Amino acid sequence: MNLFVETLGQGPDVVMLHGWGLHGGVFARVAEQLATRFCVHLVDLPGHGASPALPRFDADAVADLLAAHFPLPAQVVGWSLGGLIAQHWAARHPDKVKSLALVATSPRFVRDETWPHAQARASIEAVAQSLDGAFEQTLERFLALQMMGAPSARDTLKALRGELFSHGRPQGLLPALGLLLEADARALAGRIQCPAALFYGARDAITPIGAGRWLAESLPDAVLYEFPQASHAPFLSHEQDFVRALAEHLETQA
């Protein structure tokens, strides 16, 4: 399977994995700033952007696909769904992942009695049920939910909307949403040995900061960066602070 990948800059390899419903272009501004020091690869995950869909969006299969596409050791940045895939990649291919930067992500995206750091299942199911009949409106509502609570939500949401279909109409969002409903990667934490930097917004309703604190305690070598005023996309709402912290992490682990 051919993944759509945009590459910027030269230097140590950094692979960036986006969240559900979007594509690699969401990281364009961050990547441009990193490209003076790194070779940055912006991936469209299967079924997103310009990458073809898989019949079943399986986290292990996608991680294996990425490991084959990027055979040299790389640092991996994953946001939300991309962060879940990054955890699987690091656990399954420890020789291919030099470090992780996990942004507003979680090992589990559904709240239950054992995991309070997530949305109710019904919230994700409602998105899935409305995709067929109101595709664009559903994605825009989901974007608005991601920005809820951030002080610059209006400007950040405008930037996200501008990127939404710039790589074409995505073809495989429902299977990826199915993964978010069923995923539970908590057992992977003990298998991830590479250094990790964790970036979380205190106002995030999709992946509450408790998920980041759990990862900080469970991963063997992790540093947590909390953005008190940020929501689900600190790399957009607090771009300069985010880039500064991410670049420091990447340079330390290069």
Swiss-Prot record:
EC number, UniProt record: 3.1.1.85
Catalytic activity: 6-carboxyhexanoyl-[ACP] methyl ester + H2O = 6-carboxyhexanoyl-[ACP] + methanol + H(+)
Entry's Gene Ontology cellular component terms: cytoplasm
Binding site for substrate: 20, 80-81, 142-146, 232
Biological role stated in the UniProt entry: The physiological role of BioH is to remove the methyl group introduced by BioC when the pimeloyl moiety is complete. It allows to synthesize pimeloyl-ACP via the fatty acid synthetic pathway through the hydrolysis of the ester bonds of pimeloyl-ACP esters.
NCBIfam families hit by this protein: bioH
Protein name, UniProt field: Pimeloyl-[acyl-carrier protein] methyl ester esterase
Highest classification ranks of the organism: Bacteria, Pseudomonadati, Pseudomonadota, Betaproteobacteria, Neisseriales
